[in-house]
Amino acid sequence: SYNLKKNLKIRANIISRKLNFPLRFFKGLNICDFACGTGDNAIIYGLNKANVKGFDFNSESIKISKKRIKNLNLKNIKFTVADFYKIRGKYDFVSSTAAIHHLENPLKGLNHLKQRVKNDGFLFVSFGLRTSNIQHALMKIAVRKFGQKDQQIYKVSKKLFPNHIKRCVFYGLRKESNVIYDQFVNPQHNYLNLNQVLKTLGKNFILHSSWPKIFIPSGDSAMNDTLENYQFNKFFLSELYWSQKNQDDKTIINNTKSANYEKAFYDLSNLLNNQNNFKYFMNLKFEKTYDIIDLLINDPIDTNYNLDKSFKLFVKEIKIFMKSIKNDNLSQMSNKIKTFDKLFKGTSGLGLNYFIFQKKER
């Protein structure tokens, strides 16, 4: 059964900790939640004393939302059935999570959202990226080889991807039928290209935070940040990682870390630090320093977490699966999937990316 209290706690943690937006900042804000569903995010805003309007086209979802705020005695939230593009006005904080990739034209939807944000206001969105969802897109294509009707899709998806469905149920706090509908049956999964997202938002929208966080080589002095005004794709390395992802981050780090290598690295820095007496260093520190350097050279650890090697294996398995889509029957495809080491394992990519942008007039 759906545990509202647990889900609110998880979602509040995403906003406050993962996305660095303290919940106390919601106090007094006028907020609009587009495609609010059953109202979880809107309730979080309302519990933190914001004035909230939640809209969704689904009357059943709105009915559930209204029941929840009645039970919680929240008078500062109003839920209304409305079409996405009919919602007007400007707000301090606009949100729409796990929704716009289901629109026929997601970028048109994003453009509509950005127009609803006041200057100095915030836009909170989550959606599927095309790169993060390469594996999900392949799943959907494969399932449709064996039938287009809903019941056929339910049956085939459970045959081909049972572990993926179970994982989504467990971590997504959803029913199996809802997971299968959203992942496989729903005809509209128009995932977004992140560069197009940033272009649509324009220079007035500054990235406040994202989850997962992006990772790029960053080691310039604060006085000489060469990347500050440099135009390049800051998300490329992250998107490569998200696309092939098949394990939890903790597992990947545990499998590629070396306590000996870490110790040797820090020992090297300690041995070289503050050595003002040359003779003392040469007599007592030089040989040990030399040995540590050899250890660092010869240790087989891959400090990039084997990402390049892993990605090459990942795309090789995609090539094998493409042949399976073309030639195999259901049983053959199911058996082929079981032989993969990277593809369709564990997390199978990344379903949703979260972003908070702030609007700044320039």
Model segments located where?
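A short SAM/SAH-binding and catalytic strip from SAM-dependent methyltransferases
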Residues: 93-105
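Conserved SAM-binding loop of SAM-dependent methyltransferases across substrates and taxa
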Residues: 38-49
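A short glycine-rich, Lys/Arg-flanked "PGG" loop and its adjoining helix->strand segment in the class I
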Residues: 107-119
